[in-house]
Each structure stands twice: as C-alpha cells, then as structure tokens.
Regions:
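Conserved short histidine dyad/triad with adjacent acidic residue
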Residues: 31-49
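His/acidic/aromatic-lined binding-pocket segments of jelly-roll/cupin-type domains
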Residues: 44, 50-56, 79, 96-97
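Short acidic-glycine-tyrosine-enriched beta hairpin
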Residues: 67-91
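A short, N-terminal "cap"/entry segment at the start of jelly-roll beta-barrel domains
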Residues: 1-28, 42
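Tight coil/turn sites that cap or link beta-strands
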Residues: 36-38, 83-84, 90-92, 102
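Structural motif
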Residues: 59-61, 86, 102-104
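Double-stranded beta-helix
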Residues: 3-10, 94-128
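Glycine- and acidic-residue-biased ligand/ion/polar-headgroup-sensing regions
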Residues: 48-68
Length: 128
C-alpha cells in the first residue's frame, strides 16, 4: 500500500550529491505542503489519482489501508517517513499523514485535482 520509491541513481563528487528520485509515470500536479507538528492531513483516498510524496523536512507517520466498496478493508500499514523518503500511494488506498515534527513535502499527482469535482473521497472511519 505504501510503496517506498528507491533512488534510481546517486552520484557524488566534490560538488555534492545528485540523486534520481522518479523516472516513471505521467505526473500532472506538483504541490508544496508545509505542516506544523502534531497535525493530521489526508484521511482520504482517490479513485483515479496516484500520488507521490517526497519528504523534504520533518518526521511524518503515514497510515494506509485498502478501500473496497467505500469501506476500509484488510490490514493497516504504517510507516515513519523522514527527510529524503519518497513514497507512492495508489488509487483506492486511504492515506493519513500525522506530522511528528514540523514538516515539509512535495505532493505529486497523476491527475489535476478539479475544484468542482475533486478525486478526493472520505470514509467515516478514522485511521489515527
């Protein structure tokens, strides 16, 4: 459910480091998210949209669970993310982020979220 994306290359020299983060997909929307400590974000799923999260700063607990017929199903998966971590969330995976520290990340989406008809769906049960 929470797919860790590994670097596809890393080069280091006297100038510093250069890392390849993402070399797949057709991504349509990029967002910068800054969140204070002890805040919950998300707790929703998408029917069509894939999302990548690139953690730039802080520590974030992400919880995920599959959705079937608008209900949480199966085991809950939880990961602690820190600076440099990159994850992929597929459609029909409810995902909730809880910031353990003041955090900043880039959110990359495969679809543009339309204000009049967003691909954001919520359920009544809480993951956190």
């Amino acid at each position: 459910m929470i797919q860790i994306i590994k670097r596809y290359f890393t080069d280091r020299d006297e100038r510093g480091k250069f890392e390849g983060l993402i070399n797949f997909g057709n991504w349509r929307e990029f967002n910068l998210v800054e969140t204070n400590a002890n805040v919950t974000r998300g707790n929703h799923y998408h029917k069509k949209t894939k999302e990548i999260f690139i953690i730039l700063k802080g520590v974030v607990k992400v919880t995920a669970q599959n959705i079937v017929k608008n209900k949480l199903t199966g085991d809950t998966e939880e990961k602690i993310l820190k600076k440099g971590d990159v994850i992929l969330i597929e459609p029909y995976v409810n995902h909730t982020f809880y910031t353990l520290d003041k955090s900043k990340w880039i959110n990359v989406l495969s679809q543009i979220i339309q204000k009049d008809s967003p691909d954001i769906h919520r359920i009544k049960e809480n993951l956190i």
